[in-house]
Every structure is written in structure tokens, then in C-alpha cells.
Amino acid sequence: MKAAALMLVCALAARAEDVRVEPRQFSKQGRIFTSLGVTWLERSDYWLNPGLLLSATYYPTERGGPEARLFWFFSSLSDSAQRISSSTGFVPDARQPEALALIGWRQSLTYGKVAIAGTALHFDVQGAAHGGGLFTDRGIAPAFGASAGIVGRLGSHVFAQPDLGLLLSFEQRQKSTAALGFLPVFSLGVDL
């Protein structure tokens, strides 16, 4: 009986399809990754801050490399802040973000691939740390950011990159000088 069960298992295994393992296709070493994306800076300070992002990362090794990021914000007061301003003349003491320039390091944490509908999706899970300046309506404020995200290969040279980040800036305000914000980003790019 045991021999029959073993023969049945072996017969089923022999009929199984061959598993295809794709080689690593997402190589970064010696390449520059450039991207353009959309973002939103949320600081709970009465400013609505949608924006655009331009980013470039050079990978001297497969593990990571220096990165520069430029953000442009199209900020406006929220509806509640506009109502208060029009009725009382008061405006928030938070600065209006106009642009953000950051330089730092992007590190690949792990490489993976997932089979979806017969196609392999290659991706990197990454983390990044940056420093720079937040350009506002009242000058420049020092800023520091940290983010985590995924870089996924969409074609031979095209990639998508969602990032979730935090931004800490130091501004002159009534109660506090530190402003912490949430900075999600979605960008599409090409590697050169």
C-alpha cells in the first residue's frame, strides 16, 4: 500500500509543469535613475500642499547611492483657514511651502520578484534619508526627510516608485520651531 501511494505521488510530480526562474533583471550598478512624480505634503498646518517631484539617483553599487530630489508645491490655504482669515484677518503662523530641495542616500534593502499572470514583476524595497531646505514664503527652513518605498521594473528601462516619507522642518512659529509632515510620493522614471 505504501509503495502504491509513493508511486502515485511520483507520477503526479512527474506531470507537474516546469518551474521557470527568471534571472535578476533589475540591475542598478553604474546607472542613473531619474523620475518625475506627484506628491502631497501634509503637515496639519492649514496649508494644502500638492506638488511635483523631480528625482535622480546614481547607484555606484547595487546596494545604494546618492540621490537628489526637487519638489515644487502649489500651496493654498484650506477652506477653514480662508474663512478665518477673511472674517478676522488672522493667518496661520506656519510658512507656506513653495519648494523643497533634498540630497541624501537611497539604500536597497532587498530585491524581489513576484509572478503575476505568467509575468515576473521585479522590484526593490528601499529606504532613504535626506537633508536640505524647505523654501517658503518667508525664507528657507532646514529640512530632513526619511522614506521607505518600492521601485518596480515596468519595462527594460522604465520603473515606478511609490514612497512614503516623513519630513521634519525647522521654522519660526509662535509655539514650536519643528514641523513634522507626511510626504507620500508616486513617480515614474527611466534608468540611463
Listing of model-derived features with the role each one plays in the protein:
Residues 22-30, 45-48, 63, 111-123, ...:
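Short loop/turn motifs that connect adjacent beta-strands in outer-membrane beta-barrel proteins
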Residues 62-137, 141:
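Gram-negative (and chloroplast) outer-membrane scaffold detector with strong preference
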Residues 36-40, 52, 68-72, 107, ...:
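Transmembrane beta-barrel strands of outer-membrane/channel proteins
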Residues 57, 106-108, 115, 149-151, ...:
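Transmembrane beta-barrel domains of outer membrane proteins
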Residues 30-32, 48-52, 97-101, 123, ...:
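Residues that define the transmembrane beta-barrel architecture of outer-membrane proteins
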Residues 101-107, 179-192:
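Outer-membrane beta-barrel "beta-signal"
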Residues 15-60:
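Short glycine/proline- and aromatic-enriched beta-strand/turn motifs that initiate or cap beta-hairpins
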Residues 34, 54, 103, 127, ...:
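Membrane-embedded beta-strands of outer-membrane beta-barrel proteins
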